[in-house]
Design a protein with these regions (language model features):
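Short Cys/His-rich Zn2+-coordinating modules
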Residues: 1-13, 31-35, 49, 82-95
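Intrinsically disordered, low-complexity linker/tail regions enriched in polar/charged residues
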Residues: 7, 14-17, 74-77, 107, ...
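Short, flexible, mixed-charge glycine/proline-rich loop motifs
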Residues: 9-21, 39-43, 63-67, 90-102, ...
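Short cysteine-rich clusters marking metal-coordination/redox-active sites
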Residues: 23-26, 49-52, 73, 105-109
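Intrinsically disordered, low-complexity linkers and terminal regions
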Residues: 31, 61, 68, 98-104, ...
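Short Cys/His-rich "knuckle" micro-motifs
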Residues: 33-36, 57-61, 80, 84-85, ...
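Cysteine-rich micro-motifs
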Residues: 38-55, 78-91, 123-142
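Amphipathic alpha-helical oligomerization segments
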Residues: 62-76
Length: 146
């Protein structure tokens, strides 16, 4: 179920992506039997190409390593310790390599600028866990009005 959290929102996918004939991330056309079945509740059958799936797996693995450290470290919530900084840097490098969009703070809903202190933030929704980020200290801006 966690892998579904890294899928694009279902409503943003094309019919070709929903049917599994194209990668959900890069839109590369997939021949029958090619690609990795990502599963889905409901009629959609999304697939990913090997390159994108490997990239997303590395990103998820480094995120969870960073998160797991942060929930047990007494220092990391106010700014990373050396290990937390190394784990965060590893995750950010994987994100950059994968061409992922800028991180957004779950609290203030603004993009997190390069160099800002950040920490992973995981919470549960009824449809599964959500992997996000928070500014490591106070958010620089108030949350925009809804």
């Amino acid at each position: 179920m966690v892998l579904l959290r890294v899928l694009p929102e279902i409503h943003t996918l094309t019919p070709t992506q929903l049917s599994g004939a194209a990668c959900v991330w890069c839109r590369h056309a997939l021949r029958p039997g090619e690609g990795i079945d990502l599963g889905s509740p409901g009629p959609a059958r999304p697939h990913g190409c090997l390159s994108c799936c490997e990239s997303k797996t590395r990103s998820l693995r480094t995120y969870l390593d960073w998160y797991d450290h942060g929930i047990t470290c007494l220092r990391c919530p106010t700014g990373p310790c050396d290990r937390g900084e190394a784990l965060g840097a590893a995750h950010l490098a994987v994100r950059e390599e994968a061409g992922q969009p800028p991180m957004r703070c779950c609290a203030c809903e603004t993009d997190i600028a390069p160099g800002e202190l950040v920490r992973p933030y995981l919470w549960e929704r009824p449809d599964g866990p959500v992997l996000g980020y928070l500014h490591a200290r106070d958010c620089p801006l108030p949350r925009p009005p809804s």
